[in-house]
């Protein structure tokens, strides 16, 4: 379906190009260097070396395309594991058609949407999946395009928007990448993913009202989580015997409804923005019984292995099936304030908070200890709530349940030089939730941008991350994991 869709857009673009209209393009070339502060060793993470945007408008129709080249530095050049010299890939980030009407606009294609009132980390910004390689970037740079249709209708001070996508979008995670500071505790194999089945449509809408002193927005979105969850276990036996069971450990994606409220208050002295989202998520996999592909998890081998070998009876009987049936309510909120201080310094602060309101799930009714990769548990002590991670909302929830951010920005030399100082503090106390202002982890950032010419920019940045050794999660604490990611980076960026 997707190749046919893009072929149709390309044919339409070709037709528009030969008709009346105007075409414009812009982009950049980015030379990027990043190294650890600890030992100056190179950090081999992918980044977008080249980006090209193209716009063509013919009367009330417009085509927009964004093509990027992602460069992935090689850790070596021995060519022992692969003989290919290619170290980049092309990414068509956006390609969509816009039809401007007398009531608004209609967009169809692969596009990046922006929902919410705050500049960054909005819990309402759930339409697109995130690329975690670009987690520390801003705006659309850290999002993945969604194959969708969007509608915007304008009437006086009102705005109505809607979006519909026939595809389920998932986050891009760095898998077993030692260079990336955040890792997933469990990385399932493809065979362990339980198919959503049918057409996993995602849709949402918002209604916005503008006032002289700001605006107010109500929104709703229904879709599937961007991150997988543990959905259940099947226990297989040899015929009627379950003496030596083998397991099929399954993961899936919960279905989530998001109710949102956001707004902006403008004044002569400051601007306040806020977003609040209430999430209701449930596991739709009530029946997880299915045939296996010949491989099942062996507790003795501690890995997936063929379930039928010479001299061993086949595992052909599904004896037990335990769907988790998670049902969770949680909320996320982000409040932002920005103002101008003396000496033309722009001050911005953000407060983020997330918590679980209600949690329920089935219990695994197994008496013996189950040994599963990366989470060994006994039925009496295992609490599935400890595995819960929000599948929608701001990616900031991956780092902490409660943070506060401060940013100072100042320009010099007739806006040719821009200095930014940023700090992020984890104030979520894991031992006593009533103590809300204890600092457990921190991130400090310094960035200097200098416009060498109108088209050439030089950037220098330093990021320092600190965890806390006495945190109850020890090495699993996110800020402890990220300490080694403290780095210095330099960029030379040419715009055209």
Describe each PLM feature range.
Residues 23, 60-65, 103-106, 157-160, ...:
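Repeated loop/turn-to-beta-strand initiation elements of outer-membrane beta-barrel proteins
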